[in-house]
């Protein structure tokens, strides 16, 4: 039989496993991969293939992440799993692997632990919109009441961080026993093994509870300006990569950031030296702007659909500060620290005014390797929105990464 060609007929969703160390995140990833491979559309990935996660760089930070893909009857998934706790923190803050939703893994034998709490907090801060919970190691719990207690504790913890604790699906099972059953019998079908069935139940919950994300092209138009030049007789061209949305010749847009917001009309679009009628999310494109001088627009501004993004100077953010070994600072810093914030395409100087620990108390200083909530104020207003990622730099060297959790001014 000839191999069928891969066609993306199903909606695509990015998810990941989060939770405390040793609660079984990677085993669960392998169990899902193995279980769904029995449906025949994707090959199983083994535990050690996932565990030996390759290094990748995002915003100047090295992160280990494993990427696994699999399909249910309804969807195509890309799943990320990180080997170490620090990798999770860095991945979630840099948005290296975006998550439309996540499976929170909690050991039914131990209940929620410190990193369970930390990952829920992080998911909230960095904008992972939806969680589903897998209570792993159910085989190690003899008492049904204990299982109910762990679930109750989990739901309370989720509600504490503004997730809908009462509505989130909880599925109990054993990733290890499911993985062993499928490994022993790769042709296993739904209904033949209780542990494998629990993985199917989990994925059913993921399929129905985690919404299909809005595609980038369906969002409102935004492009960060990377370069500007003038074409004699035609006007000013701003180039960059379209972050989201669609743009057409004749559309009205706003130029936002660094100066007064102004409105202009698009008179032409170019890509690879050719003119085109519309540009889509992901395109590297040149946009010809009506009545705009080269001196009026610069790198660091954004072009956007009118009324969709505004310039700001003050925000709260969740940040990760690199260790010395990662190429970061060797010494701590204190409130009043003035680094550059690299946002989209440009550096803007700002002051960090305050640090807040996870428990809500003020922190006096920040050490390399810390994750902290901070309040910053930029010297120039730029286009900022909740969930936006940035790097913290000192003289061109990345010393941290962050994500905007709240706009203040």
From Swiss-Prot:
Region (G3): 81-84
Region (G5): 174-176
Residue stretches making up the tr-type G domain: 10-214
Molecular function in Gene Ontology: GTP binding; GTPase activity; translation elongation factor activity
Keyword tags: Chloroplast, Elongation factor, GTP-binding, Hydrolase, Magnesium, Metal-binding, Nucleotide-binding, Plastid, Protein biosynthesis
Enzyme class: hydrolase
Known EC number: 3.6.5.3
Ranges where the record places region G1: 19-26
Keyword Nucleotide-binding: yes
GO cellular component, one term: chloroplast
Chain residue ranges for the region called G4: 136-139
Pfam families recorded: GTP_EFTU (PF00009), GTP_EFTU_D2 (PF03144), GTP_EFTU_D3 (PF03143)
Subcellular location: Plastid, Chloroplast
Reactions mediated catalytically: GTP + H2O = GDP + phosphate + H(+)
Residues at which Mg(2+) binds: 26
Region of interest (G2), ranges: 60-64
Chief location category: plastid
Annotated residues for binding of GTP: 19-26, 81-85, 136-139
UniProt record similarity statement: Belongs to the TRAFAC class translation factor GTPase superfamily. Classic translation factor GTPase family. EF-Tu/EF-1A subfamily.
HAMAP family: EF_Tu_B (MF_00118_B)
Stated role: GTP hydrolase that promotes the GTP-dependent binding of aminoacyl-tRNA to the A-site of ribosomes during protein biosynthesis.
Protein name, UniProt field: Elongation factor Tu, chloroplastic
Species per Swiss-Prot/TrEMBL record: Pyropia yezoensis (Susabi-nori)
Gene: tufA
